[in-house]
């Protein structure tokens, strides 16, 4: 993990070994928020990209690096105090030896909605399409 104690993996589930639903909990006390931003903490976009890559590494049990990002949309701000729990859906497909096609969509529970799995409303904070390559380390 590049950022020690930045997040905790809560669960990782897959019905088919291609699409995964990952749940993580952010640490709102992490030192990164002292500079980004002290009174109104926001998860830096680059940290979201790193978190997604680390989840893919855990799934594939290998070190990976981004080699192409064809589309990355940050759709809403993630405040680690108000919405510490994130859900990320990852789709990982082998496209050639050592390369994976990654599609990711991250969501948070909308503030003020009922916190049950069936009725809670979600807000998308990132949509990503990229290629990850094994570093063979």
Regions flagged by a language model, labelled:
Residues 1-43:
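Catalytic strand-loop segment that frames the active site of acyl-thioester-processing enzymes
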Residues 17-21, 47, 85-87, 127:
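Intrinsic-disorder/low-complexity, polar/charged segments enriched in Ser/Thr/Lys/Arg/Asp/Glu/Gln
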Residues 19, 91-137:
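HotDog/MaoC-like acyl-thioester-processing domains
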Residues 23-25, 73, 131-133:
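Generic structural detector for well-ordered beta-strands
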Residues 31-33, 81, 97-99:
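Intrinsically disordered, low-complexity acidic/polar segments
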Residues 35-36, 40, 46, 75-77, ...:
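Surface-exposed loop/turn and secondary-structure junction residues enriched for glycine/proline
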Residues 38-59:
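Acidic, aromatic-enriched beta-alpha/helix-loop junctions
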Residues 53-91, 96, 123-129:
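Hydrophobic beta-strand-centered segment that forms part of the acyl-chain substrate-binding groove
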């Amino acid at each position: 993990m590049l950022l020690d104690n930045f997040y905790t993996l809560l669960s990782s589930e897959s019905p088919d070994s291609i699409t995964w639903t990952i749940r993580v909990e952010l640490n709102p006390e992490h030192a990164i928020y002292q500079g980004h931003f002290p009174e109104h903490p926001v998860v830096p976009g680059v940290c979201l990209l790193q978190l997604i890559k680390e989840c893919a590494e855990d799934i594939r049990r290998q070190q990976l690096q981004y080699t192409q990002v064809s589309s990355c949309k940050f759709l809403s701000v993630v405040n680690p105090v108000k919405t510490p729990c994130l859900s990320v859906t990852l789709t990982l497909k082998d496209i050639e030896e050592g390369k994976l096609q990654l599609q990711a969509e991250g969501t948070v529970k909308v503030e003020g909605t009922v916190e049950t799995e069936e009725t809670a409303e979600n807000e998308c904070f990132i949509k990503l399409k990229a290629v990850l390559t094994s570093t063979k380390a």
